UniProtKB/Swiss-Prot annotation:
<dbReference type="GO" id="GO:0005525">
    <property type="term" value="F:GTP binding"/>
</dbReference>
<comment type="function">
    <text>Plays an important role in the de novo pathway of purine nucleotide biosynthesis. Catalyzes the first committed step in the biosynthesis of AMP from IMP.</text>
</comment>
<feature type="binding site" description="in other chain">
    <location>
        <position position="239"/>
    </location>
    <ligand>
        <name>IMP</name>
    </ligand>
</feature>
<dbReference type="InterPro" id="IPR042111">
    <property type="entry name" value="Adenylosuccinate_synth_dom3"/>
</dbReference>
<feature type="binding site" description="in other chain">
    <location>
        <position position="303"/>
    </location>
    <ligand>
        <name>IMP</name>
    </ligand>
</feature>
<feature type="binding site" description="in other chain">
    <location>
        <begin position="38"/>
        <end position="41"/>
    </location>
    <ligand>
        <name>IMP</name>
    </ligand>
</feature>
<keyword id="KW-0460">Magnesium</keyword>
<protein>
    <recommendedName>
        <fullName>Adenylosuccinate synthetase</fullName>
        <ecNumber>6.3.4.4</ecNumber>
    </recommendedName>
</protein>
<comment type="subunit">
    <text>Homodimer.</text>
</comment>
<feature type="binding site">
    <location>
        <begin position="40"/>
        <end position="42"/>
    </location>
    <ligand>
        <name>GTP</name>
    </ligand>
</feature>
<dbReference type="Pfam" id="PF00709">
    <property type="entry name" value="Adenylsucc_synt"/>
</dbReference>
<keyword id="KW-0547">Nucleotide-binding</keyword>
<dbReference type="InterPro" id="IPR001114">
    <property type="entry name" value="Adenylosuccinate_synthetase"/>
</dbReference>
<dbReference type="InterPro" id="IPR033128">
    <property type="entry name" value="Adenylosuccin_syn_Lys_AS"/>
</dbReference>
<keyword id="KW-0342">GTP-binding</keyword>
<feature type="binding site">
    <location>
        <begin position="331"/>
        <end position="333"/>
    </location>
    <ligand>
        <name>GTP</name>
    </ligand>
</feature>
<feature type="binding site">
    <location>
        <position position="40"/>
    </location>
    <ligand>
        <name>Mg(2+)</name>
    </ligand>
</feature>
Length: 430
């Protein structure tokens, strides 16, 4: 029996929500370990659509414990709003089935405002953030001035922590010619939020250690994707946290040995939201066709995603940096009906062939994809639930991806419905 970490092997939006929900049936605990409410996902259960951003997908299943780990940045307003919406849909969410790390960093209104101001002021060099305060909150965490959830329980020290935070932020705001924040207003707001948030607070590392020793199965749910990792992604067009699988240990307080099997998710093609390099992007009719058929619009932002062919080089790189044991390949059905499909197998950089994506921003912009053409298929793969339901050419496509990225496919998803999943290897039993 292994614990399982689910991470994106591309730029996010790979369908992690559905796969995590599908796997959570076998898990006792579902843990979010990084990111914030900037990475939304949509789940369809019994014909009903649920949209999550901050909460673990496990909240949609009865008798499961969901945990938000210390590696997450936590927006109180977004949290309470999401809980309210889920309750309105009949989902039970309470401290009985949801725990939040007491040492989680809080996202405050000043973080959201700073994030938005930076993006607007630097339009020519904007990263393409969701303007939800994720980056500024992580900056304060690293700068050792963040307000954390447990601080709301100590009103004697909270004012001093707010003063320390504002010493930094008000200096920035003076430089940006923005009005300063008043610490008393922030204290009043946090004091009002405390009774609603503190019942969820937990010493998460201790809780998870106890559950691990009891033999409980844990599912660690990553947000975004490996190519958005602050160290291993397409820097600076990345998120502000580590998104690779190793962060599951750091972001939950467990040791690396507790991680277990790593399942990497990738689409049968490639998408990206916002700015940054995208070697296989198809800014043409093919890209538009993929986007329309795949309904490629951001869950949170509604922004259209950029679309392109499958990039085996980038996914292979994610397999290595995340230690991925098996892939969950999603949205194969979107490629139904194409006469031929292109797959990127390498790059040319300044006239030389290379087998990896370079780290430098300039080099990333100059790489040219090397494509292999694969015959398409006309028969539908949508809603397939076994290999026997798949066209022979679709199976060949999957097998070729396995060869190119050096990793087997463990799961194959053929629609947003959780039942439309072909199981090759159960990650919990690997």
């Amino acid at each position: 029996m292994a614990n399982v970490v689910v991470v994106g092997a591309q730029w996010g939006d790979e369908g992690k929500g559905k796969i995590v929900d599908w796997l959570s049936e076998q898990a006792d605990i579902v843990v979010r370990f990084q990111g914030g409410h900037n990475a939304g996902h949509t789940l369809v259960i019994n014909g009903k659509t649920y949209k999550l951003a901050l909460l673990p997908s496990g909240v949609l299943r009865e008798h499961k414990l969901s945990v938000i780990g210390n590696g997450v940045v936590f927006d109180p307003a977004a949290f309470l709003d999401e809980v309210t919406k889920l309750r309105a849909q009949g989902v039970a969410v309470s401290p009985e089935n949801l725990r939040v790390a007491e040492n989680v960093t809080l996202i405050l209104p000043l973080h959201r405002e700073l994030d938005a101001h930076r993006e607007s002021a630097n339009a020519a060099t904007a990263i393409g953030t969701t303007r939800r305060g994720i980056g500024p909150a992580y900056e304060d965490k690293v700068g050792r001035r963040a307000i954390r959830l447990m601080d709301l329980a100590d009103l004697d020290t909270l004012p001093h922590k707010i003063d320390r935070l504002l010493a930094h932020h008000n200096a920035l705001r003076r430089g940006l010619n923005l009005p300063e924040f008043d610490g008393k207003d922030i204290l009043k707001e946090l004091t009002a939020l405390a009774p609603q948030l503190l019942p969820y607070a937990e010493t998460v590392w201790r809780l998870l250690d106890i559950k691990r020793r009891e033999g409980k199965r844990m599912l660690f749910e990553g947000a975004q994707g490996a190519l958005l990792d602050v160290d291993h992604g397409t820097y600076p067009y990345v998120t502000s946290s580590n998104t690779v699988a190793a962060q599951a240990a750091t972001g939950s307080g467990l040791g690396p040995g507790a991680v277990g099997y790593v399942l990497g998710l990738c689409k049968a093609y490639t998408t990206r939201v916002g700015q940054g390099p995208f070697p296989t992007e198809q800014d043409n009719e093919i890209g538009r066709k993929i986007g329309e058929r795949g309904r490629e619009f951001g869950t949170n932002t509604g922004r259209p995603r950029r679309c392109g062919w499958f990039d085996a080089v980038l996914v292979r790189q994610a397999v290595r940096t995340c230690g991925i044991n098996g892939l969950a390949l999603t949205k194969l059905d979107i490629l139904d009906g194409f006469d031929s499909i292109e797959v990127c197998t390498g790059y040319k950089l300044d006239g030389k062939e290379i087998d990896h994506f370079p780290a430098g921003e300039g080099a990333q912009a100059r790489v040219e994809p090397i494509y292999e053409t694969i015959e398409g298929w006309k028969e539908p793969t949508a809603s397939a639930r076994s290999w026997a339901d798949l066209p022979a050419q679709a199976i060949k496509y999957v097998r070729r991806i396995e060869e190119l990225v050096g990793c087997p496919v463990a799961l194959l998803s053929t629609s947003p419905e959780r039942e439309d999943t072909i199981l090759v290897q159960n990650p919990f039993e690997a």
